[in-house]
């Protein structure tokens, strides 16, 4: 924020951003830190006061250097560089300038922060559903493939092409569609964010496929 340190700290405490053990820092103090120092200390701070556009860019870069997924919200022209640099740039639909909205990945039509929370929940649900759908499809098709290969090796025609087509239509299509529209799991928003470098096929998923 461009507000003073005292104002920013008071607001942050009131809305739960500045928790015990976390600190606030001003733009002039950021100027005194090298990029390496800022990266090292960035996780100490939850509030950045009296910051200029160049400070916001350095803050975003520092968090990204920590392998964090960074979302940046803003409505003014001075927010545009950091919004463009972040993983997810979020512009304000009502109060935002055209420049900000043009560089943003997402525009909040209602300017409500709670909409971002809803979007994160929806994104986590979609990720879970895609993962479950892929696990189901791979396990089903892998078993099918083993049977077909076994038949070829034994020179026995176990399935005709029409049989394989029927199995795929009957056992894959409907369950896959149902999995795609599953509701959010309980406690989905209490999960910690996944590491940026975490592979999609984790040991758990590979083990699940093998057992299936």
Describe each model-derived feature in a short phrase.
Residues 1-2, 73:
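Ser/Thr-glycine-rich phosphate-binding loops at phosphate-binding pockets of nucleotides
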Residues 2, 6, 33-36:
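Signature of the cytosolic headpiece of P-type E1-E2 ATPases
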Residues 4-14, 54-59, 76-85:
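Acidic, divalent-metal-coordinating active-site segment for phosphoryl/phosphodiester hydrolysis
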Residues 15, 19-71, 86, 91-212:
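Membrane-embedded transport module
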């Amino acid at each position: 924020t461009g507000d003073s340190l005292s104002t920013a700290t008071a607001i942050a405490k009131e809305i739960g951003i500045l928790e015990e053990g976390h600190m606030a820092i001003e733009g002039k103090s950021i100027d005194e830190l090298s990029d390496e120092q800022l990266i090292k200390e960035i996780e100490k701070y939850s509030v950045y006061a009296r910051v200029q556009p160049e400070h916001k860019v350095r803050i975003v870069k520092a968090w990204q250097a920590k392998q964090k997924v960074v979302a940046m919200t803003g409505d003014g022209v001075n927010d545009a560089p950091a919004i463009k640099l972040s993983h997810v740039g979020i512009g304000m639909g009502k109060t935002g300038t055209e420049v900000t909205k043009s560089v943003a990945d997402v525009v909040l039509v209602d300017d409500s922060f709670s909409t971002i929370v809803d979007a994160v929940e929806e994104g986590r649900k979609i990720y879970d559903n895609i993962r479950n759908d892929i696990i189901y499809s791979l396990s089903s098709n892998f078993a099918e493939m083993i049977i077909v290969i076994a038949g070829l090796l034994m020179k026995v025609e176990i399935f005709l092409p029409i049989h394989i087509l029927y199995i795929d239509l009957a056992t894959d299509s409907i369950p896959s569609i149902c999995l795609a529209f599953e509701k959010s799991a309980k406690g989905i928003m209490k999960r910690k964010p996944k590491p940026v470098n975490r592979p999609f096929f984790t040991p758990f998923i590979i083990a699940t496929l093998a057992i299936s």
